């Protein structure tokens, strides 16, 4: 379409935030669990994308964009995508730790009733969380497209389902509570690194797709049980104190 790459990136980030807003708005208005809404809209969005693109890959991307994803820095050891990921972590850490809206997001997740009593609009914070999630998903999509060197609609659906389990596993391993109220940004990144190492290691020893899924699912189950136990003891200690 001849749109400059910088403007295209901004539009993609805004569109990702908008899709996240839809998820949050539907969840707030219907009361359906956000997990169900997100799974449903993932399939809907993929269907619309396939319809609009006719499942054809876009390979004629600007060289500056594709080179960014393939280049290596510091004697060809470090990808700029890794540096971008670390930068994103620092931005999120600052958001949750030092900004008013970040603290409100945490408070709304930790105790919605108490947050409402203190004047925080929990529904609004809930929608903001989904918008942030959509924004970060757009960032990940841009990074992946830059690394591959093409936008391939047919691949997006497979990646969405393939990354669904690791996307849940990384934050839980990193220390984020699934029930909300506690976010560990750097822990989540380390969890993502650990999940990637486990995933790649299983593929390297050629255990087969079934066993890769089996072990990742087993780790997720253990992590969720650990999350529940941590949540239980945290609430118990708060009651005692």
Sequence positions of predicted segments:
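Membrane-helix interface residues
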Residues: 3, 30-32, 99, 120, ...
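Helix-loop-helix "hairpin" substructures at the membrane interface of multi-pass membrane proteins
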Residues: 4-12, 18-23, 74-152
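Transmembrane helix-bundle core of multi-pass membrane transporters
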Residues: 30, 34-99, 125-128, 148-160, ...
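Cytosolic-side transmembrane-helix boundaries in multi-pass membrane proteins
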Residues: 113-124, 198-241
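Transmembrane alpha-helical segments in multi-pass inner-membrane proteins
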Residues: 137, 151-216
């Amino acid at each position: 379409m001849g749109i400059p790459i910088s403007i295209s990136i901004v539009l993609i980030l805004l569109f990702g935030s908008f899709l996240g807003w839809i998820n949050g708005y539907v969840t707030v208005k219907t009361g359906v669990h956000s997990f169900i809404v997100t799974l449903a809209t993932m399939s809907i969005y993929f269907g619309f994308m396939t319809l609009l693109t006719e499942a054809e890959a876009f390979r004629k991307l600007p060289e500056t964009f594709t080179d960014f994803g393939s280049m290596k820095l510091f004697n060809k050891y470090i990808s700029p995508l890794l540096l971008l990921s670390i930068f994103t972590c620092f931005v999120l850490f600052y958001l949750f730790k030092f900004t008013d809206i970040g603290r409100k997001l945490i408070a709304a997740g930790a105790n919605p009733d108490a947050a409402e009593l203190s004047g925080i609009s929990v529904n609004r914070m809930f929608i903001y969380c989904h918008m942030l999630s959509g924004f970060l998903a757009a960032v990940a999509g841009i990074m992946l497209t830059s690394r591959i060197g093409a936008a391939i609609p047919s691949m997006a659906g497979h990646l969405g389902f393939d990354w669904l389990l690791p996307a849940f596993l990384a934050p839980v391993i990193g220390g984020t509570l699934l029930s909300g109220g506690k976010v560990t940004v750097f822990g989540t990144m380390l969890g993502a690194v650990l999940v990637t190492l486990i995933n790649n290691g299983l593929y390297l020893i050629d255990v087969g797709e079934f066993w890769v899924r089996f072990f990742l699912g087993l780790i997720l189950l253990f992590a969720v049980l650990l999350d529940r136990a941590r949540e239980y003891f945290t609430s118990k200690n708060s009651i005692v104190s």
